[in-house]
């Protein structure tokens, strides 16, 4: 029976794709890949390429990166309808996403539209912040410590509350939001407790502990994450 698979391809290194994900990628009839900018190559596709069969049908679809949900919903509905049609025609269809499909992924919106229409299965992947923690040798949590994962697009109030309440705080995709995040870290005395990792697990990975040299005007790679550790291991 044909099925729709949401497949996490991990943080960037193709060798961090799970065995199950690699096997399913090899067996797909159609692969959908997300495209943030029209005409740009999907980064997730680059990670998955070593596992794709030669004549696989690839459908790269644009997902607008805008705040308006109404604008995004039009595209979600159109793409989910196309996926459903492919599955009903007997094709095994995949949608790949960076990291894990259930962590800040467009896939979640497609799943909500499709799970009552067709057979769906979600294949987990390694998140960027779990990869970061391993590379840094820093446990995300120990004993009774708490962990928060926040998008840098959240309000200053939400980010500050997380920084005050939790022991470890991940702030994702900070590159375009330094003017919000840096003042909060400085206010709470956490600049020296913050690890910065750009392009985790990729060839151009950059790592830094302490943000005194970073300003709101600093140009950082798009895939830059802060890990705030109140107790550095």
Regions found by a protein language model. Name each.
Residues 1-14, 19-21, 26-118, 207-208, ...:
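Class I S-adenosyl-L-methionine
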């Amino acid at each position: 029976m044909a099925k729709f698979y949401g497949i996490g391809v991990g943080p960037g290194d193709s060798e961090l794709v799970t065995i199950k994900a690699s096997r399913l990628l090899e067996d797909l009839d159609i692969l959908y890949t997300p495209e943030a900018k029209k005409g740009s190559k999907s980064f997730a596709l680059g990670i998955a390429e070593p596992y794709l069969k030669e004549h696989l049908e690839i459908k790269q679809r644009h997902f607008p990166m805008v705040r308006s949900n109404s604008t995004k919903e039009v595209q979600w509905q159109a793409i989910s309808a196309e996926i459903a049609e492919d599955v009903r025609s007997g094709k095994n269809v995949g949608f790949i996403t960076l990291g894990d499909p259930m962590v800040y992924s467009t896939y979640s919106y497609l799943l909500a539209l499709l799970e009552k229409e067709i057979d769906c299965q979600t294949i987990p992947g390694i998140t960027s912040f779990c990869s970061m923690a391993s590379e840094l040798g820093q446990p995300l949590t120990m004993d009774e410590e708490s962990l928060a994962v926040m998008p840098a697009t959240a309000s200053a109030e939400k980010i500050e509350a997380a920084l005050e309440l939790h022991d470890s705080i991940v702030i994702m995709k900070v590159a375009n939001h330094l003017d919000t995040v840096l003042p909060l870290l400085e206010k709470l005395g956490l600049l020296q407790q913050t690890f910065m990792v750009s392009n985790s697990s990729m060839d151009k990975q950059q790592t830094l502990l302490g943000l005194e040299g970073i300003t709101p005007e600093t140009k950082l790679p798009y895939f830059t994450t802060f890990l705030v550790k109140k107790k550095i291991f």
